[in-house]
Amino acid sequence: MLKYINTFDNVLTRENEFGHFTASSWVLNKERTKVLMIYHKIYDSWAWTGGHSDGDNDLLYVAMKEAKEETGIKSVSPISKDIYSLELINVNGHDKRGKYVGSHVHLNVIYLLEADENEEIHVKEDENSGVKWVAIDKILEVTSEPWVRERVYAKIINKMKTDGIIGNV
């Protein structure tokens, strides 16, 4: 990622059609037993919240903003301001708002956030068709993208266990 940043000056915008930065989050409930997930229309899967940086270099801010926009929660806070994980995620070509977007890479930065499970949630109709709290031990069952499930989500769950953020679920 560092080499890519040093090579291109537009990695924070979608103008870089080969790859650009995105920020995602695992929004945990206060008991740290569930993650707030969305049913993503493009990926056709339950997924974490997140989005493009669109020129903003404060990726924690982007992750928090996207979590609020995509789920309707009003209050979310970082468990830590540190980046929790980095991922290079291939995005296959797809149609978005009537326009074809070619295959590209998301240079994805992941943060751990916390929100109140009792806060009202709602769908962001242009991006997702569902929002719900998913028990951590069920995440790998509800996610239908094999690579993300096995290489990203499983890794994050194991890291959270190792780091003592969650218990053995």
Q: What does each of the following model-derived ranges do?
A:
Residues 7, 16, 41, 48, ...:
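Residue-level signal for pocket-adjacent positions within structured domains
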Residues 144-169:
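Charged phosphate-binding loop/patch that engages nucleotide di/tri-phosphates or the phosphate backbone
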Residues 14-16, 36-38, 51, 122-124:
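Short histidine-centered beta-strand/loop micro-motifs
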Residues 1-24, 168-169:
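Acidic, metal-coordinating catalytic segment for phosphate/diphosphate chemistry
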Residues 18-23, 30, 41-43, 48, ...:
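Short connector loops at helix/strand junctions that flank enzyme active sites
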Residues 22-24, 33-35, 128:
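Short glycine-rich loop/turn motifs
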Residues 54-147:
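Unchanged
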Residues 28-30, 35-65:
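Glycine-rich active-site/cofactor-binding loop and its immediate structural neighborhood
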